[in-house]
Amino acid sequence: MAVRSRPQLAFQTEKENGIGITAFNETAKLYANVVEALDAQRLRIFDSVAGSLKTEYILEKEKVISCIAWEQKPLYASEQITTDISGSGEILVLGTNSGEILIYSEHLGSLTRTYSFGILQKIIGAHVLANDGFAIDITGKVVCFSVNTGEVRTSFTVPSSSREFSGLYLSTVFKNLALASSHNIHIVDLNHRNPIDSLTTHTSMINSVVFQYLKDENKFYFGVSANQDRFINLYSKELDGTGEFPTNTVKNVGALVCENEVKMLSIAYEIENPETGVLAALTNDGTIEMFENPWLSKLRQNGTNASSLSHRRKLLTSHSTLKICFCRSRGDPPIVLESIAFESTDSLTVVWKESTRTVFETVPWRILSSQATNGLIELVRSKTRLTSKNKTVSNVYDESNATISSGVMQKDLRKTEEIGSAEAMEGEEQEPSLAERLQNLTKLDQQAQALSTQISASTSLSTVLTQALKTNDQSLLESCFNNNNVETIDTTIRRLDPSLAPILLDKLAEKLALRPMRADVLMVWIRCTLITHGGHLVLVDDLKHKLANLHSILEDRASKYSSMLALQGKLDLVLSQIAFRKAGGSKDNAEDEEPISIYYEGYEESMDEASSTGDEGYSSDDSVDNEMYSDEENSSKGAFPDEENENRELSEDYSGDESLENSESE
Amino acid sequence: MSAPAGRLQPQRFAALPNPVTAENKFWRSFKVPVVAKEYSAITSIHFSAESPYDFAVTSGARVQIYGASSRSVKKTIARFKDTAYSGNIRKDGKLLLAGDATGLVQIFDLSTRSILRALDAHQFPVHVTQFCPYANTTFLSGSDDKTVKVWDLSTGAVQYDLSGHEDYVRTASWMSATRLVSGGYDGTIRLWDTRIADPEVMSFSHGEAIDVVLPMQSGSTVISAGGPSIKVWDLVAGRQTPTKKLSNHQKSITCLAMNSENTRLLSGGLDGHVKIYNISDWKVVHGMKYSGPILSMGLSPDSCNLVVGMSNGTLSQRTRRITKQTSSKTPFLGGVGSAFGVVGKKKQIYKGENDEFYVEEARRKRLRPFDKALKSFCYSDALDMVLENGSPVLIITMLIELLHVGGLRIALSNRDDLSLTPLINFLRKYIRDPRFSETLCIVTSTILDIYGAALGGSVMVENAISKLREKVEQEVAVTQRANELVGMLQMLSA
């Protein structure tokens, strides 16, 4: 079926501390999410087809991403984004908590623009349609800007009774038509900076909006879902083909009901045949509910005027035609999914987290729909091997994962105690008197002073190291050696009892032999010890014998110096040759060079000798990469039958090897 | 012709130092942990001297008897009015003795769990009770009323009332049928002999409140633990200074134990560590970490079960599996088999007549595919086979073998990027290992010789090579520093 399908962009915004900010691009081939790392947030881009991580970008520490969206291709003519921003690939627009807009190029793998307009607070929705960028902040202030230059085209505030906004959704069909969402939906004409319509749709915050334009009816349909709501409300807006948007033409055309609260929506329809749309709703428990032809209400289907209001209502609401869920085994609760998006009208891409991995799967739902039982498809995905590996790890002794055979769980016990003590506390709580407060203040001061004097002690590991050496505790020792901060190592060794230095050196030698890759850090330790405790080590009798181990290991390592250095030189030579050749240097040279040999009739004998010496270096090259020089060789063949022979002789060791190799492999 | 004959023998390298000692291995073999949670802190663990070495665990107001093999509760004795202390099983495994916080000392019949004796002579909590291992009817009790009492079981009367401690008595132990040692919060260890009129024979000052004393089997040494230190006292010399002071714990030591051979001392402390000392030199030979502050510990007499009780009520049992020696066929069974016509499966081989000399065929191990390839001069194939799924040592062995037979160049040449990359990746991975680096340097040089700048033809190979260069650069820096350090060492030990 050669029907082009145009799925809508699926995205999801507004989650605390950046977790759960995800977006699929228009083709559902790329998936971006923002994850919380130790210090800074990371932007990860996945290839949903291959299911692999494409790139990871570490954002600056203080930047907290609040929304994310891929570039959308508008259906109307528009100015393109310059390649230095997009890298001729797709771009991703990110909004931060502090009102900044970041443009990330997927091809270049870096942030190419950072715009700060100064008037925006926490951004909750940002979009890019070709060169037009749009952003809305939490107070409803909308800014339209040029992506290429960062110049603000218009900015205004959406007048609304609600204090908080949740997103901005743009039409790819009509320029300047947008939906701003809070508890309500505001249809906005960006050109005239005025809201056309305001609809009261939900009682809670709207989390997802999808829309579709039906040309035949000249109507603009959209579906709205909100947090903690099972209903998806559907509306239609009539347009009068003048390019202006008339007001008050919005009609509620029905509602879709899910079994659980809706998390996000996704829609897909075929461009040629827009009547056949399909809407997918992802619910909080991880089930996907599919609604085919969502805009086609039963009311219109029946064509009759329903007798009573309740009957009308019943006809207006419709249930899903198909439910899909993933579970570990049949009957288990479904796996909670992170996001969904349509690849085409027939297949749906699904993402979920498998411990730290992100798993993608494409569901050909129309094909699978024949297997549905009671309108539900359960897809069993057992845990991956990765997690089973973790299980074997847990065999290592640890009280926390050991099986408890009797008694009560201490955790539960503690809870009850805590409740008891909390209740007791409430009774006793009283405001401290002024004198008590003063005392507390002086105490705090003293503590602060004490802390400042102890800082030097806290940066050293000498106590731990002493204990580890005394008790021969390998794991404790390992925890010390893992430290690679030179300053810490230095202070630690300075504080160490000199009598322990020989033991420390012995242990270091052992580690060095076992873990040659960690030589960098371990040698810092050895160096510090030798320098700091050198004075004491000289006094130790029989030191040579005691440190024989260390000496031999170091000497062994040191003996590799010259060969390694030589190897480095060789590698340098080869790599720089490669670089040189890539730059086109060798070709230029080849052209500039004088011909290697010139054929003069009558001078044959004398020439042969001269050319043979000149060719020696060259011939080895020839035999290695025949492709590069084959042309030259061919050309020379006819002219120098003698030289050709000589070449063969010179490269005997190579060609000889080859022939041997060939005969053997046969 | 220098064709390699037979199987490739793996290259041997100088043995690496092994940080795991035999001692570590032994103590690590205590695994298969089972954890039980009790309501309150576990104050005492005592093993029965009788096989199967069940043990009594005292926590809160009850004493539980755990089965050694099932490692779960067999019996529960909860007939205490207050917190119970020091559940102690008699050496024949029939009676249990325990003190409690009211000062009552009770003796239970373990089979029926009935109270045989309830003795109320102490006014204050009794923290320690112990049956005399040398006489069935004698036991001791030590109390917070600063006294140690020696009782006769048959009459239930106090035989000796030993007073002398100036603070709570928290630990006491039998040294022989008539001699005792006790320690208390006054920081003294006192030795008592019940045969003489003035029973206090000797006393040592530990310096800190003593939580546990342990007499050694020889009778000449007593070990005491108080605060974060252990002190070893020599009774024969009778000196007031300890012969050895061990301070390997960060916090108070709460329990001591000996293994049945009297060669290792175990100590557990509030820092959650159990440390094991070799008593010949008092060096720590092994350490174990537990999740909570340790209050009590017991090692079964057959050294199979290590039980540790913690202040948060966790009871951890670790068990060592003893592999049974597979007994060779007893002659009796063999006889029976032959009697019933069971014929041994061993094939009869003709070994010749008496005057003939039988030459046994030497058994050869089968050649592996790469051995065969090597034998038939397919050097390149042999190397590929090893590279595909061989241990690093095997790969190195193959490379060295190829060097020796002069086939390295053949094996390395005529490769495309797909077959060259795994080799370069192997080089990159192991070139920093001093055991391998010499060989690998030669291999790398050979590759560079053969291919030279043609390596740039493939992006994959070029990437691999540039990564290899990074490694080599790091190694150059390391070896340079190693040279410096060797210089330092020479200066110090000259």
UniProtKB/Swiss-Prot annotation, chain A:
Subunit relationships: Component of the ribosomal small subunit (SSU) processome.
Xref: PANTHER family: WD REPEAT-CONTAINING PROTEIN 43
The family this protein is said to belong to: Belongs to the UTP5 family.
InterPro entries xrefs: SSU_processome_Utp12, U3_snoRNA-assoc_WDR, WD40/YVTN_repeat-like_dom_sf, WD40_repeat_dom_sf
Subcellular location as annotated: Nucleus, Nucleolus
Ranges where the record places region Disordered: 603-666
Spans of repeat WD: 14-56, 60-114, 201-246, 259-301, 316-362, 495-535, 570-609
GO biological process: maturation of SSU-rRNA from tricistronic rRNA transcript (SSU-rRNA, 5.8S rRNA, LSU-rRNA)
GO cellular-component term (any): small-subunit processome
Keyword field: Nucleus, Repeat, Ribonucleoprotein, Ribosome biogenesis, rRNA processing, Transcription, WD repeat
Name the record gives this protein: U3 small nucleolar RNA-associated protein 5
Biased composition (Acidic residues): 618-633, 641-666
Keyword Cell membrane part of the UniProt annotation: no
Encoding gene, per UniProt annotation: utp5
Role played: Involved in nucleolar processing of pre-18S ribosomal RNA. Required for optimal pre-ribosomal RNA transcription by RNA polymerase I together with a subset of U3 proteins required for transcription (t-UTPs).
One Gene Ontology molecular-function label: snoRNA binding
Matching Pfam families: Utp12
Swiss-Prot record, chain B:
Compartments (UniProt record): Nucleus, Nucleolus
Gene3D superfamilies, sorted: YVTN repeat-like/Quinoprotein amine dehydrogenase (2.130.10.10)
Coiled-coil regions listed in the entry: none
GO molecular function per UniProt: snoRNA binding
InterPro entries: G-protein_beta_WD-40_rep (IPR020472), U3_snoRNA-assocProt_15_C (IPR018983), WD40/YVTN_repeat-like_dom_sf (IPR015943), WD40_repeat_CS (IPR019775), WD40_repeat_dom_sf (IPR036322), WD40_rpt (IPR001680)
Record keywords, A-Z: Nucleus, Repeat, Ribonucleoprotein, Ribosome biogenesis, rRNA processing, Transcription, WD repeat
CDD domains (alphabetical): WD40
WD-type repeats, residues: 37-76, 79-118, 121-161, 164-202, 205-243, 248-287, 289-328
Main location per the UniProt record: nucleus
Subunit structure: Component of the ribosomal small subunit (SSU) processome.
Function, in words: Involved in nucleolar processing of pre-18S ribosomal RNA. Required for optimal pre-ribosomal RNA transcription by RNA polymerase I together with a subset of U3 proteins required for transcription (t-UTPs).
Name under which the protein is recorded: U3 small nucleolar RNA-associated protein 15
Organism in which the protein naturally occurs: Schizosaccharomyces pombe (strain 972 / ATCC 24843) (Fission yeast)
